[in-house]
């Protein structure tokens, strides 16, 4: 491996770590500001009613769920809709870390009902210009990935 290859590899690792941290920061901020839609069904409803408010779509899946055909079909439809509406998309693994970031599911009538974390939409208010640094960094990463013909970039959220 040449020096240039080593430097490029180190830069790629640092970039991935920065984008992962930006996604985590963005999710926490969006949830706190009530700008996060969680769940495949809820995401589909929102994109049908107000697609212009959506600024980022995260499709989350772990390796053991990759064979879930129904989920893959949902993802394909959501990706298509996002591409048609110029919504940035990121594929994410690390469902447990995602659950940690978004908090434990609320208890409903004595039973714990797990939320569907497979699709997350970050929305932007039409009335203000809400832009977090995390959103800017993730959008930049998505644009850079599209320039490299990777239309749906992938990141891995690591448990802590």
Curated annotation (Swiss-Prot):
Keyword Plastid: no
Keyword match Ion transport: no
Tissue note: In myeloid precursor enriched BM cells.
InterPro entries: GADD45, Ribosomal_eL30-like_sf, Ribosomal_eL8/eL30/eS12/Gad45
Entry's family note: Belongs to the GADD45 family.
Function, in words: Involved in the regulation of growth and apoptosis. Mediates activation of stress-responsive MTK1/MEKK4 MAPKKK.
Protein's name in the database: Growth arrest and DNA damage-inducible protein GADD45 beta
Species name: Mus musculus (Mouse)
Taxonomic lineage from the root: Eukaryota, Metazoa, Chordata, Craniata, Vertebrata
């Amino acid at each position: 491996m040449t020096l240039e290859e080593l430097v490029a590899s180190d830069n790629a690792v640092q970039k991935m770590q920065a984008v992962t941290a930006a996604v985590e920061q963005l999710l926490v901020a969006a949830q706190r500001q009530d700008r996060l839609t969680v769940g495949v069904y809820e995401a589909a409803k929102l994109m049908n009613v107000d697609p212009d408010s959506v600024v980022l779509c995260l499709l989350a899946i772990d390796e053991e769920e990759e064979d879930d055909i129904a989920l893959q079909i949902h993802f394909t439809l959501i990706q298509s809709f996002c591409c048609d509406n110029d919504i940035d998309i990121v594929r994410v693994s690390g469902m447990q870390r995602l659950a940690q970031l978004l908090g434990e599911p609320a208890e409903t009538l004595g039973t714990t009902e797990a939320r569907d974390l497979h699709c997350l939409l970050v929305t932007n208010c039409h009335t203000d210009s809400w832009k977090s640094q995390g959103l800017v960094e993730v959008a930049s990463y998505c644009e850079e990935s599209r320039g490299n013909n990777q239309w749906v970039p992938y990141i891995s959220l690591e448990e802590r």
